[in-house]
Protein backbone atom coordinates (compact mmCIF):
# COMPACT_ATOMS: atom_id res chain seq x y z
CA UNK A 1 0.00 0.00 0.00
CA UNK A 2 1.33 3.41 -0.97
CA UNK A 3 0.33 6.74 0.54
CA UNK A 4 0.47 9.71 -1.81
CA UNK A 5 1.34 13.20 -0.61
CA UNK A 6 3.67 14.57 2.02
CA UNK A 7 2.25 15.24 5.46
CA UNK A 8 5.22 15.16 7.79
CA UNK A 9 3.06 15.93 10.81
CA UNK A 10 1.23 12.62 10.48
CA UNK A 11 4.06 10.51 9.05
CA UNK A 12 4.61 8.52 12.30
CA UNK A 13 0.95 7.50 12.36
CA UNK A 14 0.98 6.60 8.67
CA UNK A 15 3.99 4.34 9.31
CA UNK A 16 2.20 2.73 12.26
CA UNK A 17 -0.82 2.01 10.04
CA UNK A 18 1.40 0.48 7.37
CA UNK A 19 3.08 -1.82 9.89
CA UNK A 20 -0.24 -2.91 11.35
CA UNK A 21 -1.56 -3.74 7.88
CA UNK A 22 1.53 -5.88 7.23
CA UNK A 23 1.15 -7.82 10.47
CA UNK A 24 -2.62 -8.25 10.61
CA UNK A 25 -3.68 -11.81 9.65
CA UNK A 26 -5.05 -11.71 6.12
CA UNK A 27 -7.58 -14.44 6.79
CA UNK A 28 -8.53 -13.16 10.24
CA UNK A 29 -7.69 -14.64 13.61
CA UNK A 30 -6.29 -13.50 16.95
CA UNK A 31 -4.32 -10.26 16.96
CA UNK A 32 -2.77 -8.67 20.02
CA UNK A 33 -3.32 -4.90 20.25
CA UNK A 34 -0.68 -2.85 22.02
CA UNK A 35 -1.60 -0.48 24.85
CA UNK A 36 -1.89 3.18 23.87
CA UNK A 37 1.52 4.76 24.40
CA UNK A 38 0.14 8.30 24.33
CA UNK A 39 -2.03 7.58 27.38
CA UNK A 40 0.81 5.70 29.03
CA UNK A 41 2.95 8.84 28.94
CA UNK A 42 1.03 10.34 31.88
CA UNK A 43 2.10 7.47 34.12
CA UNK A 44 5.72 7.50 32.98
CA UNK A 45 5.52 11.24 33.62
CA UNK A 46 4.37 10.54 37.17
CA UNK A 47 7.44 8.36 37.58
CA UNK A 48 9.64 11.29 36.57
CA UNK A 49 7.94 13.40 39.26
CA UNK A 50 9.06 11.01 41.96
CA UNK A 51 6.28 8.44 42.18
CA UNK A 52 7.31 4.80 42.02
CA UNK A 53 5.52 3.78 38.83
CA UNK A 54 6.08 1.00 36.33
CA UNK A 55 3.88 0.83 33.26
CA UNK A 56 3.14 -2.81 32.49
CA UNK A 57 3.15 -4.17 28.93
CA UNK A 58 4.77 -1.07 27.47
CA UNK A 59 4.78 -1.27 23.63
CA UNK A 60 8.02 -2.66 22.20
CA UNK A 61 7.32 -2.99 18.46
CA UNK A 62 8.34 0.57 17.69
CA UNK A 63 5.15 1.19 15.70
CA UNK A 64 3.90 3.88 18.06
CA UNK A 65 6.08 6.97 18.06
CA UNK A 66 4.95 7.75 21.62
CA UNK A 67 6.51 4.50 22.82
CA UNK A 68 9.73 6.54 22.73
CA UNK A 69 8.43 8.73 25.57
CA UNK A 70 10.64 7.01 28.13
CA UNK A 71 13.69 8.27 26.23
CA UNK A 72 12.53 11.85 26.72
CA UNK A 73 11.91 11.72 30.47
CA UNK A 74 15.49 12.96 30.83
CA UNK A 75 14.31 16.00 28.83
CA UNK A 76 16.80 16.75 26.04
CA UNK A 77 17.19 20.32 24.88
CA UNK A 78 15.01 19.93 21.78
CA UNK A 79 12.05 17.68 20.98
CA UNK A 80 10.25 17.49 17.61
CA UNK A 81 6.57 16.65 17.07
CA UNK A 82 7.48 15.14 13.69
CA UNK A 83 10.40 12.86 14.53
CA UNK A 84 10.57 12.39 18.32
CA UNK A 85 7.09 12.26 19.87
CA UNK A 86 3.46 12.37 18.76
CA UNK A 87 0.62 13.43 21.04
CA UNK A 88 2.73 12.70 24.13
CA UNK A 89 4.79 15.78 23.32
CA UNK A 90 2.04 17.64 25.22
CA UNK A 91 2.95 15.66 28.33
CA UNK A 92 6.60 16.59 27.88
CA UNK A 93 5.73 20.27 27.38
CA UNK A 94 3.70 20.45 30.59
CA UNK A 95 6.52 18.82 32.57
CA UNK A 96 9.24 20.97 30.97
CA UNK A 97 9.01 23.96 33.37
CA UNK A 98 10.02 21.56 36.17
CA UNK A 99 13.26 20.62 34.38
CA UNK A 100 16.66 22.11 35.16
CA UNK A 101 17.44 23.25 31.62
CA UNK A 102 15.69 25.12 28.78
CA UNK A 103 13.86 22.91 26.29
CA UNK A 104 12.51 23.78 22.84
CA UNK A 105 9.57 21.87 21.36
CA UNK A 106 9.52 22.16 17.59
CA UNK A 107 7.27 21.32 14.62
CA UNK A 108 4.08 21.83 16.65
CA UNK A 109 1.90 23.03 13.77
CA UNK A 110 -0.34 19.96 13.84
CA UNK A 111 -1.26 20.70 17.47
CA UNK A 112 -2.98 23.88 16.34
CA UNK A 113 -5.71 22.04 14.43
CA UNK A 114 -6.64 19.24 16.79
CA UNK A 115 -9.20 19.29 19.64
CA UNK A 116 -8.25 22.89 20.30
CA UNK A 117 -5.46 25.28 19.35
CA UNK A 118 -3.12 23.32 21.58
CA UNK A 119 0.02 25.42 21.16
CA UNK A 120 -1.74 28.55 22.34
CA UNK A 121 -3.66 26.61 25.01
CA UNK A 122 -0.50 25.09 26.48
CA UNK A 123 1.29 28.44 26.52
CA UNK A 124 -1.68 30.22 28.09
CA UNK A 125 -2.37 27.70 30.83
CA UNK A 126 1.29 27.10 31.72
CA UNK A 127 1.81 30.85 31.97
CA UNK A 128 -1.08 30.97 34.47
CA UNK A 129 0.92 28.54 36.60
CA UNK A 130 4.05 30.69 36.56
CA UNK A 131 5.91 28.93 33.75
CA UNK A 132 8.37 30.89 31.64
CA UNK A 133 7.38 29.93 28.11
CA UNK A 134 7.69 31.65 24.75
CA UNK A 135 5.90 30.87 21.48
CA UNK A 136 7.89 31.40 18.29
CA UNK A 137 6.22 30.16 15.13
CA UNK A 138 5.44 26.48 15.66
CA UNK A 139 7.98 26.20 18.48
CA UNK A 140 7.55 26.56 22.23
CA UNK A 141 10.63 27.51 24.23
CA UNK A 142 10.29 26.54 27.89
CA UNK A 143 12.61 27.76 30.64
CA UNK A 144 13.13 26.21 34.09
CA UNK A 145 10.41 27.75 36.26
CA UNK A 146 10.98 27.11 39.98
CA UNK A 147 8.13 29.46 40.91
CA UNK A 148 5.34 27.25 39.54
CA UNK A 149 2.04 27.53 41.42
CA UNK A 150 -1.54 26.33 41.18
CA UNK A 151 -4.20 27.93 38.98
CA UNK A 152 -7.61 27.24 37.46
CA UNK A 153 -6.92 25.49 34.17
CA UNK A 154 -9.18 25.83 31.15
CA UNK A 155 -9.17 22.45 29.42
CA UNK A 156 -10.83 23.70 26.19
CA UNK A 157 -12.87 20.47 26.15
CA UNK A 158 -9.61 18.74 25.21
CA UNK A 159 -8.94 15.40 26.88
CA UNK A 160 -5.17 15.73 26.64
CA UNK A 161 -5.13 19.20 28.18
CA UNK A 162 -7.05 17.81 31.16
CA UNK A 163 -4.79 14.78 31.59
CA UNK A 164 -1.56 16.74 31.15
CA UNK A 165 -2.45 19.33 33.77
CA UNK A 166 -3.74 16.65 36.15
CA UNK A 167 -0.23 15.21 35.93
CA UNK A 168 1.29 18.62 36.68
CA UNK A 169 -0.89 18.75 39.79
CA UNK A 170 1.12 15.89 41.32
CA UNK A 171 4.04 18.29 41.71
CA UNK A 172 2.32 21.69 41.73
CA UNK A 173 -0.37 22.04 44.43
CA UNK A 174 -3.55 23.93 43.63
CA UNK A 175 -4.16 22.84 40.03
CA UNK A 176 -7.92 23.06 39.38
CA UNK A 177 -9.38 21.70 36.15
CA UNK A 178 -12.43 23.09 34.40
CA UNK A 179 -14.53 20.44 32.63
CA UNK A 180 -12.39 17.45 33.66
CA UNK A 181 -15.07 15.18 32.17
CA UNK A 182 -13.59 15.79 28.71
CA UNK A 183 -11.19 12.88 29.40
CA UNK A 184 -14.07 10.57 28.46
CA UNK A 185 -13.08 10.90 24.80
CA UNK A 186 -10.20 8.44 25.22
CA UNK A 187 -9.72 7.58 28.91
CA UNK A 188 -12.96 7.66 30.96
CA UNK A 189 -11.34 6.01 34.00
CA UNK A 190 -8.26 8.27 33.91
CA UNK A 191 -8.97 9.90 37.27
CA UNK A 192 -9.78 6.53 38.80
CA UNK A 193 -6.31 5.37 37.76
CA UNK A 194 -4.79 8.49 39.28
CA UNK A 195 -6.58 8.00 42.60
CA UNK A 196 -6.46 4.20 42.98
CA UNK A 197 -3.95 2.84 45.46
CA UNK A 198 -0.77 1.29 44.01
CA UNK A 199 -0.18 -0.99 42.22
CA UNK A 200 -3.51 -0.37 40.43
CA UNK A 201 -3.01 3.38 40.31
CA UNK A 202 -0.98 6.34 41.54
CA UNK A 203 -2.65 6.95 44.89
CA UNK A 204 -3.14 10.66 44.17
CA UNK A 205 -5.87 12.44 46.15
CA UNK A 206 -8.43 14.25 43.98
CA UNK A 207 -10.89 16.78 45.37
CA UNK A 208 -14.12 18.20 43.99
CA UNK A 209 -15.02 21.88 43.77
CA UNK A 210 -16.28 21.73 47.36
CA UNK A 211 -12.92 20.50 48.64
CA UNK A 212 -14.25 17.03 49.36
CA UNK A 213 -12.19 13.99 48.36
CA UNK A 214 -13.98 12.23 45.52
CA UNK A 215 -14.88 8.56 45.67
CA UNK A 216 -13.80 6.03 43.09
CA UNK A 217 -17.30 5.95 41.61
CA UNK A 218 -17.43 9.74 41.29
CA UNK A 219 -14.15 9.78 39.38
CA UNK A 220 -15.42 7.68 36.47
CA UNK A 221 -16.54 9.81 33.54
CA UNK A 222 -19.48 8.27 31.68
Positions of PLM-derived features:
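Short, structured segments at the rim of ligand-binding sites
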Residues: 1-222
Amino acid sequence: MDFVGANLDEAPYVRMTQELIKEFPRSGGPFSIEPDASSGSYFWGANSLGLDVEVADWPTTGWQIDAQFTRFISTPREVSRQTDLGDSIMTAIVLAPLADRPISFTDLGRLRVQECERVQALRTELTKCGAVIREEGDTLHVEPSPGMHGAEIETYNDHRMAMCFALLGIKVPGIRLRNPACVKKTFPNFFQKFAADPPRGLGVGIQGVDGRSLSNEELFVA
